Curated annotation (Swiss-Prot):
The gene is fusA. GO terms for molecular function: GTP binding; GTPase activity; translation elongation factor activity. One of its GO terms (cellular component) is cytoplasm. The keyword Nucleotide-binding applies. It comes from Ehrlichia chaffeensis (strain ATCC CRL-10679 / Arkansas). This is Elongation factor G. One of its GO terms (biological process) is ribosome disassembly. GTP binds at residues 17-24, 81-85, 135-138. Keywords: Cytoplasm, Elongation factor, GTP-binding, Nucleotide-binding, Protein biosynthesis. CDD domains: EF-G, EFG_III, EFG_mtEFG1_IV, EFG_mtEFG_C, EFG_mtEFG_II. The lineage of its organism: Bacteria, Pseudomonadati, Pseudomonadota, Alphaproteobacteria, Rickettsiales.
Length: 690
């Protein structure tokens, strides 16, 4: 069957949520009902097609974002199923960067959970329009209306309810469609593939009319024609109402809310309708800003098939059959195999060989891709996550992605000489795939240090190293990735001077060091005027600071959240060089640390604990003993929900302790919140161990 693949018929969406909310289960139903696959893969059976890694099948969780394409009502839908576990947040981040819309899946019992908040904020960051799907409405304790309230309270969003559940918990059978004012009931015998429309149950008519009125009040505000009809008391057609909702979603004025039970095969087809009806096409999104490399001016890139080729690489992975795969989102133009493109970030060319459409880890060769497409390119040599690919005659750079700092590290030692050789190759490939993974060598012990986002993240990396690269290694106990920063502004003058006979080394720098707000990272600025330092030497100053800040003077941890401004300096016509200025910058940094009030920072985790009432006292007492602070407590049915902030250093082994104090009935989830100053007594111990 031929299909119109023009931009208006394309949707690029992500499925995002907290772990265990049902993202992958929802995606599997979407693939089944759209005909992409003829069977339903269940997560709990390790058979979900989108969870193709061995680690995903064993753990029943999504670890890496998986891409696929399906068709619904004449529209092409490119889907990325993202992880819900906090350790793999980077997969959500880079997926949202290239998506036009998203479906946020919520557990109908738990509502808005901590990682739900994290991915929602990430979607806010990239202005991604979204739809809410309240899943698991068949489960005991499911409460649709409380979930809608939590969207307002916790996410600060404006929900637009389009459906109401018919029946509660095990009696959930279908939904009330508030657009058409009818019921939709699913047929169990057909695995939910068939359903029928009917009258709204009499006991729900009043509530349906109440929410229909709320829907109309919000939707008509964006359309004069609809607003006039509404105030005149006249009927508003479904097509006009959908047009109003679509405009509101694209402008992020509100978020449509639907409900269902993906596992019980109810509610997925209307969700697909909503994706097509309300989420934006590539040509609906605002023009993207880019840097014109030739002029250094900011330009706007319009999503157009007829424009010049522009794409962003958002993911790199290794495929054992194909080799290196680079996932790209094409924003403009066309890309054909056997052509050459420019990596504008690296200022190098890449030859395009195979262009692949992906379905999880299955590949389909195509000869051409165009604006709006998400495809994988085989065999690129230099391109990494965040690089821009474009035509040779129009070098431009799209806004790059920001990645979080690792919060945990482990020492990795190969068991044999053969393992040592393979480990270097394995880790270099894994680091290239995952921007949230870091690697360095401890200069004192010679150990390889692997840095990641949490215990599970590092555990999966080590497991992949063993399975995919046949590397056996001894693994050290996880350690907290502390950081250092400064608390005072100070200007340092430093002269680097060295005479060795013949040409010497000379560089003088005046650098103003200033503390920055948490999360700012490192910033460098040059305010050199009048040729005090030739411009070709200034990158040496920045490189010197970048290199030395990786190992602070206080305890040897990276220094973050500060700005260095090069305000003055001097050079020698013969003895100055970029290396001399790099060494001068390092000397200035060493002098600065002792004068700028250096402090040690530790990662603080936001922890949500769900516990039966009778264990709440023990749980709170334990939080206090871990240097934690309770921020909020809520009732949720017969349990208490405790929101706390606890240092990561005190969270090792917490799952075992929590099970012990609650007889296995309490559970928790955590994710990175911020870095905070370490108490003085802890600083002393940490410096001693370093």
């Amino acid at each position: 069957m031929s299909i119109d693949n023009e931009l208006s018929k394309c949707r690029n969406i992500g499925i995002m949520a907290h772990i265990d909310a049902g993202k992958t289960t929802t995606t599997e139903r979407i693939l089944f009902y759209t005909g992409k696959q003829n069977r339903i893969g269940e997560v709990h059976e390790g058979a979900a097609s989108m969870d193709w890694m061995e680690q995903e099948k064993e753990r029943g969780i999504t670890i890496t974002s998986a891409a696929t394409t399906c068709f619904w009502n004449g529209h092409r839908i490119n889907i990325i199923d993202t992880p819900g576990h906090v350790d793999f947040t980077i997969e959500v981040e880079r997926s949202l960067r290239v998506l036009d819309g998203a479906v946020a899946v919520f557990d109908g019992v738990a509502g808005v959970e901590p990682q739900s908040e994290t991915v929602w904020r990430q979607a806010d960051k990239y202005n991604v329009p979204r739809i809410c799907f309240m899943n698991k409405m068949d489960r005991m304790g499911a409460d649709f209306y409380r979930c809608v309230d939590m969207v307002v309270e916790r996410l600060g969003a404006t929900p637009l309810v389009l459906q109401l559940p018919i029946g509660i918990e095990k009696d959930f059978v279908g939904v009330v469609d508030l657009l058409e004012m009818r019921s939709i009931i699913w047929d169990e015998d057909s695995l939910g593939a068939s359903f029928h429309y009917g009258e709204i149950p009499k006991d729900m008519l009043d509530k349906a009319q109440e929410y229909r009125n709320k829907l109309l009040e919000s939707a008509v505000e964006l359309n004069d024609e609809a607003m006039n009809l509404y105030f005149e008391g006249k009927e508003i057609s479904v097509s006009l109402l959908k047009s109003c909702i679509r405009a509101g979603v694209i402008q992020s004025k509100f978020v449509p809310v639907l409900c269902g039970s993906a596992f019980k095969n109810r509610g997925v087809q209307p969700l697909l309708d909503a994706v097509v009806d309300f989420l934006p096409a590539p040509n609906d999104i605002p023009m993207m800003e880019a840097l014109d490399v030739k002029t250094s001016n900011t330009i706007n890139i319009k999503s157009s098939i007829d424009g010049k080729f522009v794409a962003l690489a958002f993911k790199v992975m290794t495929d054992k059959f194909v080799g290196s795969l680079t996932f790209i989102r094409i924003y403009s133009g066309r890309l054909s195999s056997k052509t050459t493109v420019l990596n504008a970030v690296k200022n190098s060319t890449e030859s395009i060989g195979r262009i692949l459409l992906m379905h999880a880890n299955n590949r389909e060769d195509i000869t051409e891709a165009k604006a709006g497409d998400i495809v994988a390119l085989a065999g690129l040599k230099k391109t990494v996550t965040g690089d821009t690919l474009c035509t040779l005659d129009q070098p431009i750079i799209l806004e790059r992605m920001e990645f979080p700092e690792p919060v945990m590290e482990i020492a990795v030692e190969p068991k044999s000489t053969a393992d040592q050789e393979k480990m270097g190759i394995a880790l270099s490939r894994l680091v290239a795939e995952d921007p949230s993974l870091g690697m360095c060598v401890n200069p004192e012990s010679g150990q390889t240090i692997l840095k990641g986002m949490g215990e599970l993240h590092l555990e999966v990396i080590v497991d992949r190293m063993r399975r995919e690269f046949n590397v056996e290694a001894n693994i050290g106990a996880p350690q907290v990735a502390y950081r250092e920063t400064i608390t005072k502004s100070v200007e340092i003058e430093y002269i680097h001077k060295k005479q060795t006979g013949g040409a010497g080394q000379f560089a003088k720098v005046n650098i103003l060091f200033e503390p920055l707000p948490p999360g700012s990272g490192f910033q460098f600025e040059s305010k050199i005027t009048g040729g005090a330092i030739p411009k070709e030497y200034i990158p040496g100053v920045q490189n010197g600071l970048e290199n030395i800040r990786g190992s602070g003077m206080l305890a040897g941890f990276p220094v973050i959240d500060f700005k260095a401004t090069l305000v003055d300096g001097a050079f020698h016509e013969v003895d100055s060089s970029p290396l001399a200025f790099e060494l001068a910058a390092k000397g200035a940094f060493r002098d600065m640390v002792n004068k700028a009030g250096a402090i040690l920072l530790e990662p603080i985790m936001k922890v949500e604990i769900i516990t039966p009432d009778e264990y709440m006292g023990d749980v709170i007492g334990d939080i206090n003993s871990r240097r934690g602070r309770v921020a909020e407590m809520q009732d949720r049915h017969n349990t208490k929900v405790i929101l706390a902030f606890i240092p990561l250093a005190k969270m090792f082994g917490y799952v075992k302790d929590l099970r012990s104090m609650s007889q296995g009935r309490a559970q928790y989830s955590m994710y990175f919140s911020c870095y905070e100053q370490v108490p003085d007594n802890i600083v002393a111990n940490e410096i001693k161990t370093k």
